[in-house]
């Protein structure tokens, strides 16, 4: 039977509950209590030798400490920071001098520290009670020792102990700590600060002060039968040895604290809970090296308060303090929540939650205590309303803060985090609603009482003082309407001359002190309504009105530009008896108004563009309007009137053409005086402009930036007699200069007529020219040779009908000359058939002419051909701009990048493959030459089709456009033909996609419109001699059985439009839905381009 191994000098088996250490010599294990080694000391031992091995191997050696500035008494390196709590830190802290706490600590006898005293004076500063007499505090006799604490609390009680030198917490039994306390050789500095003994036998020896019992929420409002037990924070025992130090902290939950020193002495380092100090504390506490920074060095003042034996110190909510124990000390303490500083308690609680601090003196169930207090306040409000009394102001303010906290805790996203502390059987939503109602009733009642008090006083000074206090700080509310000022100033003008001194109040050299925070809080709560009440009650008194007008006039004159100096002369008088009393108040308001005007002007200039210096006077004129001076317009913005100015200066009525719409787009963009959002500083608040500048329209404008880039590299344009060379000067060019559009080019005689009648022919031509211009951007003479001569000849005739200028360049024998000739045709074509396009397309034509170096001889040579193409000037084209806000951008998106079927993207690199020289006709385009030429060709080819149809079956005679479905046109456009057609690949004239798509679009228009306009027919017959015969005769010779591809489209789809019989029959029929107007028909026809290229 194996024996159980034994260890240590006591030769006992291994015990898991006892600390043991191994000897490095004999490798045996020893209990720490048997060999005198504490568990906390073991990490510092490098080599341990048991008592038996010490005789042969020597004593144990400790680790070499390299951070004496942190944990040891040795010399500290100058480079490394001092650790808080180390011996070097304590030494420096003792030698440092601090401001005396006499300035902030109130010394009050215990008998005077009552509830009435606290409500009257508040509890915002520490209170030191020299003796416990009259305080109601019960503590043991001074002969009470630490050993007595062990006896009454229990030696096995586990306590949290702070290692001061390392600023770390550990747990020990009370017996072990008491043994350490009475030991003569203290190797460490240990501190017990959170021994709560309210549930032990020692609780009967200690009772908190009476004032704490009366103020504490937990003592008064927490039900005894609640499911959650009361927080045990009222009775703490502090056992601190010499040089114990607790770093700066805020008590958990923002609770107030009381300390009574039974034995020894304690030193408190107190810091006010100002907003800046709390922010600094939060930043310091969240730093990883906060234990190496003394927080008192970061604030303006830290007060030193020494509490000696028998004294009691009360520390209010939110105060940041640290404690030092110069000698061994035994003290008692407690924490409590109260209604005198609810706001500070809530703020400290939020800071604690953000920092996620694990304080040793945690206030458990803080939110539960707040809920119980809220329920009590609701009952108190109801009782006060029934009795006709008013609750104290601090309770009303505390109820508002609590109700706001309740709302935040019960929000949907935060409820899961806070519902654990919600008391049982509570209806939070109902409590919040009822409490808000009672608060509102209480505030209304208090405001109703206030005018009565003012009436009893019946003094001008009192009225003026109330008016000054309750006047809101907003410059808008402080300024009456301009019309009221003018009326009063007219009446007061005679008094102005007599009173030179009181009217012009001198500017004080130093600004007066701002009002205290409690006053501003009251002003925030009901400032607006209080102001109204005070104005109504004080309106009959003339001195008040004079004073207000005098101040308002001076404030306005300082806000106005220097040229408005008339306001300085009309100064209102103030009676002599009121000048002495009110001069300081007026100066205060004057400083406030002056600061606001300067800050507003500073923000305006900071956020404005360079032209803002020219616009500031106009804006200040508008600010003087009655709208800006309206008292009810509390939240009006600085540039709210700028919107009115913009609406007056909006675009004039312009042509509905495409570039007319683009010009409107340019003019719509207001000339900005500031950035997209203007922030106006108003006492530290930022207000956002109600009408921001819309930047959305800038994105499409950048799409046209390639036109500007093109202009930068173009050669100097050639001066021509028929084109205005000064067209580059635009009256309404934008500041950025990304797109310049000529608006001064002289149009033709018929241009204004068509412009006024809403014609869109100009816009369509401009679209074609823009498309041609983009399509020809990257062509050069060496890119690729042209197509065969027969193909060029056929396509040239077709494009001369359509006036598609860019593709002429691919038909010339010499590549570069063809480009110049095509641009010449483009320039003259726009001049001849301007119809409203002269103003908008002039600059693009000049750019095109400048790039291709137009020859004047070629220009005259092609003039006759173009004259024959444009004989339909009496035709009125309906506008297409209603499809999109910016049709030029929509139509550009329909273009193709190359000969592929992919749609054109404006952001992609423009460079179509050769020999294609032009883009297909874009959506919204209608060119008269295409209609007339193709209609005439269709008329001739339809007769040939009629002769062929006699030899065919009866089913083919019934072929009409009414029976032709969209699938027919789709299949034809995809390259399939009917029985009378041939594949498009066999026809040489169909090798250019631009010409085929142009012809197909117009042919589809004729075929799908059963009742075309009569102008179209007359024009097509008149132009048939040139367009049809001159172009197609050679191509159609000997091929009567196989007509050309354009004829295929027109023959299959247009017999009703070309045949007189079908035309007469069609007039009797009702037009199709969506095909009544030319605009509808054209829009329907142009959709065939979306499926890809057309093969004829």
Curated annotation (Swiss-Prot):
UniProt crosslink position (Glycyl lysine isopeptide (Lys-Gly) (interchain with G-Cter in SUMO2)): 711
Post-translational modification comment from the UniProt entry: Phosphorylated by PKA on specific serine residues, leading to the formation of an active lysine demethylase complex.
Localization per Swiss-Prot or TrEMBL: Nucleus, Nucleolus; Chromosome, Centromere, Kinetochore
Residues with Phosphothreonine modification: 479
Record has Zinc-finger as a keyword: yes
Record note on what altering residue 7 to A does: Abolishes binding to H3K4me2 and H3K4me3
Catalytic activity, EC: 1.14.11.-
Record keywords: Acetylation, Activator, Centromere, Chromatin regulator, Chromosome, Dioxygenase, Iron, Isopeptide bond, Kinetochore, Metal-binding, Nucleus, Oxidoreductase, Phosphoprotein, Transcription, Transcription regulation, Ubl conjugation, Zinc, Zinc-finger
Binding site for Fe cation: 249, 251, 321
Tissue: Widely expressed, including in liver (at protein level).
Biased composition (Low complexity): 960-1009, 1027-1040
Catalytic activity: N(6),N(6)-dimethyl-L-lysyl(9)-[histone H3] + 2-oxoglutarate + O2 = N(6)-methyl-L-lysyl(9)-[histone H3] + formaldehyde + succinate + CO2
UniProt feature, compositional bias: Polar residues: 1053-1065
One GO CC annotation: nucleolus
Region (Disordered): 447-634, 646-674, 719-799, 817-846, 877-1078
Regulation of activity: Enzymatically inactive by itself, and become active following phosphorylation by PKA.
Basic and acidic residues: compositionally biased ranges: 548-563, 578-624, 665-674, 729-757, 916-925
One Pfam family matching this protein: PHD
GO terms classed as biological process: chromatin remodeling; liver development; negative regulation of rDNA heterochromatin formation; protein demethylation; regulation of transcription by RNA polymerase II; transcription initiation-coupled chromatin remodeling
Modification type Phosphotyrosine: residues: 728
Keyword Ubl conjugation: yes
Description of how the protein assembles with itself and partners: Component of the PHF2-ARID5B complex, at least composed of PHF2 and ARID5B. Interacts with HNF4A and NR1H4. Interacts with RELA.
Family: Belongs to the JHDM1 histone demethylase family. JHDM1D subfamily.
Protein's recorded name: Lysine-specific demethylase PHF2
Annotated organism of origin: Homo sapiens (Human)
